[in-house]
From Swiss-Prot:
This is Acetyl-coenzyme A carboxylase carboxyl transferase subunit beta. Residues 23-292 form the CoA carboxyltransferase N-terminal domain. The keyword Cytoplasm applies. Zn(2+) binds at C27, C30, C46, C49. A zinc finger (C4-type) spans 27-49. GO terms for biological process: fatty acid biosynthetic process; malonyl-CoA biosynthetic process. It holds the Pfam family Carboxyl_trans. NCBIfam families: accD (TIGR00515). Its EC number is 2.1.3.15. GO terms for cellular component: acetate CoA-transferase complex. InterPro entries: AcCoA_carboxyl_beta, Acetyl_CoA_COase_Trfase_b_su, ClpP/crotonase-like_dom_sf, COA_CT_N, Znf-ACC. Component of the acetyl coenzyme A carboxylase (ACC) complex. Biotin carboxylase (BC) catalyzes the carboxylation of biotin on its carrier protein (BCCP) and then the CO(2) group is transferred by the transcarboxylase to acetyl-CoA to form malonyl-CoA. It comes from Escherichia coli O6:H1 (strain CFT073 / ATCC 700928 / UPEC). The gene is accD.
């Protein structure tokens, strides 16, 4: 037996450690490999480059409202294919696919609860549901949120993330722009605050209606906000747009929004603003609140 064969016979192959799928993810901006649970604890914000990734509607509302205070509103409302609409795919099939993918009935989730003990109603878009498009159920749930805020005499907060009106519902989708705007007029008459938080992206009919009607319009960093997208505008005007066009930093320079707030600071900032507007005591930033329990980071990172 040669010396090479003797060495080979003494080598015991090790089993390759298997890492469950979904434990690791990659930042869309800087490409950093991130531990999924740690990223969730950081509210989907990259710890390396501060890129704000998209967040599910439920995670956003659970990260905002006090634990144990959340009550969902309008969950019984479901979309219907009244027009029997079909493009490359039947609308009812698109709905079924989106509902299966997101485990949501439609693109807006509404909850009431407390924020540092203060009663509020909050709504958040689920962008993964058909691009967060606004149909009749989104409009109805938003109006339900307004009605609940009026009933409870409390503020309303809405986190927008939408591509605009849902084309599969045609005019019924477009009329939600007027319906939601009219509902907000009642908030104004009552003197109750409505804060609109613009996240990436907020476009089309949503940006042209309730998303820009806040008493205070707050944006997350680098959020794309506008009506038509930059590519469409460039093709229409046949000119190159300036860097950062339609991003929140560009809009605040032009006075289109009121402030930019990082996601980890959003909860306390909203509570502080609303406490002042409602003439209530300032929130205590040291108030205890159970966070997400994060399991230990695995020893091995995924192979590149």
């Amino acid at each position: 037996m040669s010396w090479i064969e003797r060495i080979k016979s003494n080598i015991t192959p090790t089993r390759k450690a298997s890492i469950p799928e979904g434990v690791w993810t990659k930042c869309d901006s800087c490409g950093q490999v991130l531990y999924r649970a740690e990223l969730e604890r950081n509210l989907e914000v990259c710890p390396k480059c501060d890129h704000h990734m998209r967040m599910t509607a439920r995670n956003r509302l659970h990260s905002l409202l006090d634990e144990g205070s959340l009550v969902e509103l309008g969950s019984e409302l479901e979309p219907k294919d009244v027009l029997k609409f079909r493009d490359s795919k039947k609308y009812k099939d698109r709905l079924a696919s989106a509902q299966k993918e997101t485990d949501e009935k439609d693109a807006l989730v509404v909850m009431k609860g407390t924020l540092y003990g203060m009663p509020v109603v909050a709504a958040a878009f689920e962008f993964a549901f058909m691009g967060g498009s606004m149909g009749s159920v989104v409009g109805a749930r938003f109006v339900r949120a307004v009605e609940q805020a009026l009933e409870d005499n409390c503020p309303l907060i809405c986190f927008s993330a939408s591509g605009g009106a849902r084309m599969q519902e045609a005019l019924m989708s477009l009329m939600q722009m007027a319906k939601t705007s009219a509902a907000l007029a009642k908030m104004q008459e009552r003197g109750l605050p409505y804060i609109s938080v613009l996240t990436d992206p907020t476009m089309g009919g949503v940006s042209a209606s309730f998303a820009m009607l806040g008493d205070l319009n707050i944006a997350e960093p680098k959020a794309l906000i506008g009506f038509a997208g930059p590519r469409v505008i460039e093709q229409t005007v046949r000119e190159k747009l300036p860097p950062g066009f339609q991003r929140s930093e560009f809009l605040i320079e032009k006075g289109a929004i009121d402030m930019i707030v990082r996601r980890p600071e959003m909860r306390l900032k909203l509570a502080s603003i609303l406490a002042k507007l409602m003439n209530l005591p300032a929130p205590n930033p040291e108030a205890p609140r159970e966070g997400v329990v994060v399991p230990p980071v695995p020893d091995q990172e995924p192979e590149a």
